[in-house]
Amino acid sequence: MGTYYIKQKVFSFKDSFSVFDADQQEVYRVKSKLFSLQDRLTITDLNDQPLVEIKQQLAFLKPRYIIEENGQQVAEVTKNFTFFKANFSLKPQNWSLDGDVWSHQYTLTDGNEPLMHVTKKWFTWGDTYEMQIEDESHLLTYIAVMIVLDMVLHNNNGSFSMDGGGGE
């Protein structure tokens, strides 16, 4: 099992995050396009080489994001309509991300098998998420899923939501 932290950079004109390992060593960066009509973020290595693209798809009620590695789609993340909960489905994996938007605790599962547990850290400068990952073979996809969660819960992306998804 591995532990990683996603920390939002506070004083930035665009969405910007750093990903740290359990030893607090930066391992990845996440940057958004400054002037873009749709959310589009890139996960890079420390040399700013792109590894993963996260692209928002236009949707009326259900925010949807495409995650691509090397130009190939690896996942489609869709926010499901729920009251006071976070619930996302991932295709083609059949994974589900569920959690409580008030306590900020989330679990990514494959059926009943937990893949990742996430807790938002309180009293930090900017958003910080702690990720406990069971199997690191999909680490970049897990990081991308957490970035999508943060974007949907904070930005609401123009979608109607009854679950606390309009900012915190």
Describe each model-derived feature in a short phrase:
Residues M1-E168:
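Intrinsically disordered, low-complexity proline/glycine-rich segments
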